[in-house]
Structure formats: structure tokens, C-alpha cells
């Protein structure tokens, strides 16, 4: 069987992770990387060629699945429907509140072109979403809890870096251990935002910056920190470079419910990741395989992780899966 031919749009942390993940899957090959930058300035780790993103349309006969590696704020809302005109696509759109409208926009383009587009792939949305559905279906009487961390939040880190006087910064989301244990114990607590997570900032200041002023701006920032207990730590650039340049993340989905007359049941799924973008990339590549198979079977339109059987993610045949993993 010929390899699944993959293209990548965008060559940042996620795009580089997808490139590496493809190399770990023998049934796939990377055909091309598409970038908004001058292709001659982009050095890739594989043998794939690099092209301007505007030239992608010319490759519709050479690529089975295009993996879109842009950001959710401005890139994917435009790129999702755009590339669905010509390719089966995978993306990691993660603005939860806007997923329904994004789905509709991509679906309209994919239905028209006859392509398959799997949106909002990754771990949240993605694998966590699947486990929320599983928990509700199996334990209809109960409560679902999602905890994130310990992990670096890129959006919140960017928000801190935009503050005047900040040279560099990262922000970690931390699940509050007492809250997690109460859920695991089957107490079904009603938890506020502040009771579920804390935020921790590590900040390098510009020379002469006003530390108390910066700290106050951080802890009172609406939509980011004002609803959380936030700790701000000021450190040197050397300490920052030594200890805070990784991109770890993770979390838990816990369904606490009842079955039978009064049996307490806990269903839990957890992740502990050294690299958020590299793990997300691996999920994207697995769903690229599924998108290709769905397309070959005559499917079209937008899909989410809820629409795709797990068996389609695996390179193994249905018979192998029944024998080895069932």
C-alpha cells in the first residue's frame, strides 16, 4: 500500500512537531511544507521541499492530507475553510466557544469540494473531549471535571510578555491538589474557577522596570488572572533560560458518578506531557490517517473527534486490532 502523502501549512513549534511525528509513522510521507516566509529562509529537518503558502493549490494532486499548523486566533479561522477547498485537512482549532461556527464554515467548504476536514484535533479539544463524552455516556448520573496542568499556558504567557517593563515571562497553570483529591474521593464538589486552578508567573524584568506595578498589572488582568490566585516570581534572565524554556503541560478529565443503587464510580483520564506541541502534533498525524481513510471511503465534510472510530487512527488492520488489542 502506498504511503499517505502529507503536507504541512506553517512551520512553527507545531509544524516542526508534525514533521517529526510523520517520521515515526512508516505509512506516511511528508511531501511539502508551506510557509508565509521566504521559502529559502526556512530550513526543515526532513527531505521535504518548502514552498510559499500561496502555491499550495497547485499540489492538490500530490497531497492526500494537509495538516494546518497555524494559530487559532487569526490563522485557522481563515485557513480552515480556505484549504478545505482543495485538500483533506486536519487542524487544532482550540477556541472552545467558537468551535460551532468554525465547524460550519469548514463544513461548507469541505462539502462543496468533497473533502474531509477534521477540526479541533489535539488533547483539549481532542482527547479530553472524547473522555468527557465517554464519562457522561457511561455514568449519566454524575459530574465531569477538567483540570489542566501542571503546564505552560502559551496564551497567558504572551499576555504577561505584553506588559510594559517585562522582558520575558512564562505562566504555568496548576491544578489545586485539594480540589483534585475531593473529586477523586467522589465528593462531587461545586468548585469555582479559583478553587480549581492557580496560576504561577516567572518574569524577567527590563532594566529599571517597576516590579510592584508589573505584579499588580498581572494579578488584576481581566479574563486572564483576575479570577485566580496568582503568584508572580521575578527572576534573572539566566535562571529563566535554565529552567523555563520547555513547554510541558497535561491535566485530568474526571467523571465522578453513580451506578446501581448507590455505587460511587470514578472514570479518569490523564496526561503528563514534556512537550505540549510535540504531543499535539502526534495526535494530528494519527487523525490525518483517519481523514485519508474516510476520504477513500467516500466521506466528505467537516468532522470532529466525536465522529471518528478509534480503529481508523491506527495503522493496523481491523483484524490486527481485534487480535492484539481488544
UniProtKB/Swiss-Prot annotation:
How does changing the pH alter activity?
Optimum pH is about 10.5 for the oxidative deamination of meso-diaminopimelate and 7.5 for the reductive amination of L-2-amino-6-oxopimelate. The rate of the amination reaction declines markedly above pH 9.0.
Q: How is this protein's activity controlled?
A: L-2-amino-6-methylene-pimelate is also a potent competitive inhibitor (5 uM) of this reaction. Glyoxylate inhibits the reductive amination of L-2-amino-6-oxopimelate about 30%. The enzyme is inhibited completely by p-chloromercuribenzoate and HgCl(2) in vitro.
Regulation: induction:
Constitutively expressed. Not induced by meso-2,6-diaminopimelate.
Q: What NCBIfam families is this protein classified in?
A: DAP-DH
Q: Which organism is it from?
A: Lysinibacillus sphaericus (Bacillus sphaericus)
What other comment is given for this protein?
The reductive amination proceeds through a sequential ordered ternary-binary mechanism. NADPH binds first to the enzyme followed by L-2-amino-6-ketopimelate and ammonia, and the products are released in the order of meso-2,6-diaminopimelate and NADP(+).
Return the protein name: Meso-diaminopimelate D-dehydrogenase
The pathway that the record names for this protein is:
Amino-acid biosynthesis; L-lysine biosynthesis via DAP pathway; DL-2,6-diaminopimelate from (S)-tetrahydrodipicolinate: step 1/1
Gene (name only): dapdh
Q: What is its EC number?
A: 1.4.1.16
The catalysed reaction is: meso-2,6-diaminopimelate + NADP(+) + H2O = (S)-2-amino-6-oxoheptanedioate + NH4(+) + NADPH + H(+)
User: Which InterPro entries does the annotation name?
Assistant: Diaminopimelate_DH_Ddh, Meso-DAP_DH_C, NAD(P)-bd_dom_sf
List the SUPFAM superfamilies hit by this protein, alphabetically: Glyceraldehyde-3-phosphate dehydrogenase-like, C-terminal domain (SSF55347), NAD(P)-binding Rossmann-fold domains (SSF51735)
Spell out the subunit comment.
Answer: Homodimer.
Amino acid at each position: 500500500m502506498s504511503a499517505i502523502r502529507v503536507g504541512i501549512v506553517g512551520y512553527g513549534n507545531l509544524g516542526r512537531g508534525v514533521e517529526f511525528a510523520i517520521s515515526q509513522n512508516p505509512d506516511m510521507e511528508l511531501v511539502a511544507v508551506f510557509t508565509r516566509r521566504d521559502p529559502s529562509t526556512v530550513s526543515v529537518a526532513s527531505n521535504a521541499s518548502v514552498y510559499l503558502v500561496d502555491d499550495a493549490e497547485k499540489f492538490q494532486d500530490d497531497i492526500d492530507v494537509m495538516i494546518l499548523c497555524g494559530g487559532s486566533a487569526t490563522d485557522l479561522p481563515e485557513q480552515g475553510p480556505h484549504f478545505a477547498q482543495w485538500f483533506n485537512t486536519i487542524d487544532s482549532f482550540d477556541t472552545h466557544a467558537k468551535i460551532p461556527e468554525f465547524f460550519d464554515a469548514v463544513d461548507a467548504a469541505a462539502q462543496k469540494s468533497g473533502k474531509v476536514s477534521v477540526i479541533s484535533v489535539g488533547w483539549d479539544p481532542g482527547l479530553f473531549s472524547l473522555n468527557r463524552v465517554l464519562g457522561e455516556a457511561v455514568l449519566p448520573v454524575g459530574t465531569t471535571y477538567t483540570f489542566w496542568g501542571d503546564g505552560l499556558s502559551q496564551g497567558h504567557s504572551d499576555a504577561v510578555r505584553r506588559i510594559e517593563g517585562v522582558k520575558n515571562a512564562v505562566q504555568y497553570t496548576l491544578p489545586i491538589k485539594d480540589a483534585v483529591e475531593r473529586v477523586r474521593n467522589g465528593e462531587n464538589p461545586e468548585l469555582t474557577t479559583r478553587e480549581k486552578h492557580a496560576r504561577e508567573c516567572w518574569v524577567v524584568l527590563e532594566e529599571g522596570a517597576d516590579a510592584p506595578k508589573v505584579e499588580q498589572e498581572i494579578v488584576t488582568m481581566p479574563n486572564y488572572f483576575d479570577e485566580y490566585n496568582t503568584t508572580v516570581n521575578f527572576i534573572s534572565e539566566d535562571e529563566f533560560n535554565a529552567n523555563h524554556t520547555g513547554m510541558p503541560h497535561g491535566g485530568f478529565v474526571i467523571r465522578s458518578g453513580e451506578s446501581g443503587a448507590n455505587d460511587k464510580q470514578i472514570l479518569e483520564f490523564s496526561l503528563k506531557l514534556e512537550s505540549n506541541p510535540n504531543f499535539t502534533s502526534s495526535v494530528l498525524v494519527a487523525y490525518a490517517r483517519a481523514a485519508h481513510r474516510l476520504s477513500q471511503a467516500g466521506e466528505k465534510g467537516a468532522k470532529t473527534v466525536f465522529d471518528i472510530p478509534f480503529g481508523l487512527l491506527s495503522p493496523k488492520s481491523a483484524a490486527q486490532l481485534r487480535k492484539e488489542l481488544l
